[in-house]
Amino acid sequence: MESERTVGGRRSPTVVTGPLADYAAGFRQFLIAQGYARRTITVQVSLMAHLSRWLQAEGLTVDALRSSADIDRFFAERRARGHSSAVSANALVALLGFLRDRQVIGGPAADAGTPARRLLADYRRYLREERGSAAATVRGFSACAAMFLRVLPAERLEEALAAISAADVTRFVAGWAASRSPAYSKSMVSALRSVLRFLHSCGYIPRPLASAVPAVPGWRVAGRPRAVTGREVTAILAACDRGSARGRRDYAILMLLTRLGLRAGEVAGIGLSDIDWRQGLLMVRGKGNSLDGLPVPVDVGEAVADYIRHGRPRCKSRVLFVSVRAPFAGLSAASIGSAVRRACEAAGLDGFGPHRLRHAVACQLLREGASLNEIGQLLRQRDPRTTARYAIVDAGALAGLARPWPQGAER
């Protein structure tokens, strides 16, 4: 197996020859910047050297790396030569990502040029440039668009789009929402309306069908979620191993969720420059690209500072919360949810998601005498009905609002 060579008792870096030679130094620096361990960097550069020699022997250029068939042929030969590590296409994720970022190669050849792919790329560009949508919105709406296009025949996509009717839209929503929660389905229909408006404006569909998307009922009073108690909040905070990097990170995440009532996506989107330590303010990017400054309680600030000093890896990413292992990428909203569920498991509790902690903040404020209007302002909610829904989970507070039965009504 290729590795660092030993020359005069000392190790020297693997020399890359062939079509990839010009990119070897940059790739090595890329891996270092991403925080990969020295041994991993050695393996990755050795793999690059082997791949480059193989390309040269086969008379292929770097552009051949867009072909999954050529990549499979390389790994088949690598396994046949007795290699036991880095023997599948997953081992090339870092190298291919590096080459694509630098526009040395394009996307996979099998995916390029299909009508659906081109349409999705145009839709993402529309959301970013014309609508000014946040990154999370672009991802979510694009996923909905992909699911919608997937039910249409790929070989005659434009013809199928032109023939879509309001009844087709209704059937799609009904079939998709049947196995999803009302909350998730409601977000999906919002995305679908956006997709249909885009398709109509671009001439793919002749009629405006956004209004044909049916509404999804969202109120489920009989099945109202159980409120997370203060004792449970204390338990999940205590369950974090604050002696480890992951524990410090998860503790800081939980403090932001339980003290400020942030959404998972808002926590994931916090950057290092969003914290004003002198003023004690945190800039939060919310729904609709809103930007709000929230005062940071002392205990929350201490948790975040402890993570930055002793738990956050040194890396180029400017996102506050990053993965604990290389490559050090910013956490997604789903990763924030995983941190909550991990703490629940460690505390011996039934798992719940980050939004339940937002409910808990609202309920606690309600118990302390805050009005629904004040709670809505703190949680940055535009619709008072949304805030009222949080109050449903606190039966005790609602009971306190009930007027006593008139004594004169007794018989």
Put a short name on every predicted segment.
Residues 1-411:
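Conserved catalytic core of the tyrosine transesterase superfamily
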